[in-house]
Amino acid sequence: MLDLDLIRNDTEKVKKALLKKIDNVDFTELLKLDDERRKLIHEVEVLKNKKNEASKQISNIKSQGGKVDESFFKDIKEISNKISELETSLEPIKGKMDTFLEALPNIPDEDVLPGGKENNKVVHVYGEKPQFEFEPKDHVELSNIHDLIDYKRGTKLSGNGFWIYKGYGAILEWALLNYFIEEHIKDGYEFILPPHILNYECGRTAGQFPKFKDEVFKVGSNGEGEGMQFILPTAETALVNLHRDEILKEDELPKKYFAYTPCYRVEAGSYRASERGMIRGHQFNKIEMFQYTKPEDSDAALEELIGKAEKLVKGLGLHYRLSKLAAADCSASMAKTYDIEVWIPSMNEYKEVSSASNARDYQARRGKIRFRREETKKIEYVNTLNASGLATSRVLPAILEQMQDKDGSIVVPEVLRKWVGKDKL
């Protein structure tokens, strides 16, 4: 959620910044509601002061043994009723303002380019595209040759967009997850296994709700409204809520977490023919990294997360590139995002395996996640950051395709061999 004071005090600057992401925003109605709200709050404060003064007078009269005139009690009752009336009238105003503010995306950082994917910029490329002296196979064919993935039975069990890992497919998948987990533990991140079913407030704090509430798998009969529960689309949705409604100590920051979960996605639209196999599905495994930091530390934290994700891909020996996303290609909650994209030879494309993002204080405002400065005792919002570390459903196809030999065998990345038990499949 954006800072209302910033919108009020520098409306044009906020409008201009948001134009990088969305169409022009008209703040007229919001500012009008804000004026009403502030006037009502002022009236309530004046009446509360009058009530306090009347209560003090009653106490003084009683302490001196005097008799309190009934008019005092009548006045206090009238003031209390008026306060209650004004506070009731504040509720719909606040509701309208919250609805408006919750629909706004985060303000992009100044160094983020406007527009969509067409303005994404490649920062650097790691390694060379693999060159084959034979006709390379795609990951679906290689999976079939080695009996790694059962797409047919996955569809039978759950429908399109699902698959079954089997044999060395399951072993490779588990090896990847173990490799990622081991590296994050070495780096001092705390391991979290969160619930997979979350409440509405989790989606709202993350910035995914209310806009995207129909793009998740809902659970049970409470499918609508704030009583709904849903299956997490990413562990970020859980991790950003760990400290919701909390005030942290300054010396507790930064807090560094990572979580393993399957991710469940209701994808809009149809898949491209080239995105068959594991490239896009309704369920996939992912390790998610997350940090809570002080505002002045979040830029360095983003660099750390990017570096960690890149190190994992480098460790696997995969060719990839790092791209900085333009504003409209960043998710609504994020001020800045970098994507790590691995090369998929059969598609002649790079596909994202990690997004590393800085939400600044956008999610913290929604979830009331704050910290107290040790020196000033001032309470401020934390900054929140996340990065995939990594998503396996793109990594495994990249390994199969980039590491294949002419005979269809697959070279197992060295970092995975202690779990796989083989150098080659």
UniProtKB/Swiss-Prot annotation:
Recorded metabolic or biological pathway in which this protein acts: Aminoacyl-tRNA biosynthesis; selenocysteinyl-tRNA(Sec) biosynthesis; L-seryl-tRNA(Sec) from L-serine and tRNA(Sec): step 1/1
Localization: Cytoplasm
Gene3D superfamilies, alphabetized: Bira Bifunctional Protein, Domain 2, Serine-tRNA synthetase, tRNA binding domain
Keywords from the UniProt entry: Aminoacyl-tRNA synthetase, ATP-binding, Cytoplasm, Ligase, Nucleotide-binding, Protein biosynthesis
Positions of ATP binding: R265, V266, E267, E352, V353, S354, S355
Listed InterPro entries: aa-tRNA-synt_IIb, aa-tRNA-synth_II, aa-tRNA-synth_II/BPL/LPL, Ser-tRNA-ligase_type_1, Ser-tRNA-synth_1_N, SerRS_1_N_sf, tRNA-bd_arm
Binding site for L-serine: T234, A235, E236, E288, S388
GO terms classed as biological process: selenocysteine biosynthetic process; seryl-tRNA aminoacylation
A cellular component term, taken from the record's GO annotations: cytoplasm
Enzyme Commission number(s) of this protein: 6.1.1.11
Pfam families: Seryl_tRNA_N, tRNA-synt_2b
Catalytic activity, as annotated: tRNA(Ser) + L-serine + ATP = L-seryl-tRNA(Ser) + AMP + diphosphate + H(+); tRNA(Sec) + L-serine + ATP = L-seryl-tRNA(Sec) + AMP + diphosphate + H(+)
Signal peptide positions (record): none
PANTHER family per UniProt: SERINE--TRNA LIGASE, SERYL-TRNA SYNTHETASE
Function: Catalyzes the attachment of serine to tRNA(Ser). Is also able to aminoacylate tRNA(Sec) with serine, to form the misacylated tRNA L-seryl-tRNA(Sec), which will be further converted into selenocysteinyl-tRNA(Sec).
Protein's name according to its UniProt entry: Serine--tRNA ligase 2
Protein species of origin: Clostridium acetobutylicum (strain ATCC 824 / DSM 792 / JCM 1419 / IAM 19013 / LMG 5710 / NBRC 13948 / NRRL B-527 / VKM B-1787 / 2291 / W)
Annotated gene: serS2
